[in-house]
């Protein structure tokens, strides 16, 4: 079996149906003795250019291992599902299991934001006191 990386974009109005779509694709892959090595739901993101007059889409990334027939079934499912705006399938030489750069940067940004917010609150609390001391 070969390894593939698949990214598909879902219409933003259909974001609520993404978990069901993921589960449907998961059952197709695992039903044919395939494996999902990595599954990331990137959520709603801004598009680089409008697609069908839309400026946002819901992104999903999957790294899978499956045979050609299963891949054709998945791609057929993407093509005939009106909620899927675009899909891209890339053949990989080996399984990719570590988080993508987008997922890493998202978790790093959240971790960086939390301490920065605490520091700004402390600084904001110190400023009024220092102004009062300077005026006295």
UniProtKB/Swiss-Prot annotation:
InterPro entries reported for this sequence: Ribosomal_bS6 (IPR000529), Ribosomal_bS6_CS (IPR020815), Ribosomal_bS6_sf (IPR035980), Ribosomal_S6_plastid/chlpt (IPR020814), Transl_elong_EF1B/ribsomal_bS6 (IPR014717)
Pfam (any one): Ribosomal_S6
An annotated GO cellular component: cytosolic small ribosomal subunit
Disordered, as annotated region: 96-136
A single GO molecular function term of this UniProt record: structural constituent of ribosome
Keyword Repeat attributed: no
One GO-annotated biological process of the protein: translation
Keywords assigned: Ribonucleoprotein, Ribosomal protein, RNA-binding, rRNA-binding
NCBIfam families, sorted: S6
Protein task: Binds together with bS18 to 16S ribosomal RNA.
Similarity comment: Belongs to the bacterial ribosomal protein bS6 family.
Protein name: Small ribosomal subunit protein bS6
Naturally occurring in which organism (per UniProt): Methylococcus capsulatus (strain ATCC 33009 / NCIMB 11132 / Bath)
Highest classification ranks of the organism: Bacteria, Pseudomonadati, Pseudomonadota, Gammaproteobacteria, Methylococcales
Gene that specifies this protein: rpsF
């Amino acid at each position: 079996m070969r390894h593939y990386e698949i990214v598909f974009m879902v219409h933003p109005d259909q974001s609520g149906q993404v978990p069901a779509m993921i589960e449907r694709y998961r059952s197709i892959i695992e039903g044919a003795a395939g494996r999902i090595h990595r599954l990331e739901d990137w959520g709603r993101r801004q598009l680089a250019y409008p697609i069908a007059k839309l400026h946002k889409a819901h992104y999903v990334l999957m790294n899978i291992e499956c045979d050609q027939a299963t891949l054709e079934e998945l791609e057929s499912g993407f093509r005939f599902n009106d909620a899927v705006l675009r899909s891209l399938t890339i053949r990989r030489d080996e399984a990719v299991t570590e988080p993508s750069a987008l997922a890493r940067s998202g978790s790093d940004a959240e971790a960086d934001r939390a301490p920065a917010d605490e520091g700004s609150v402390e600084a904001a609390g110190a400023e009024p006191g220092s102004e009062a001391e300077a005026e006295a």
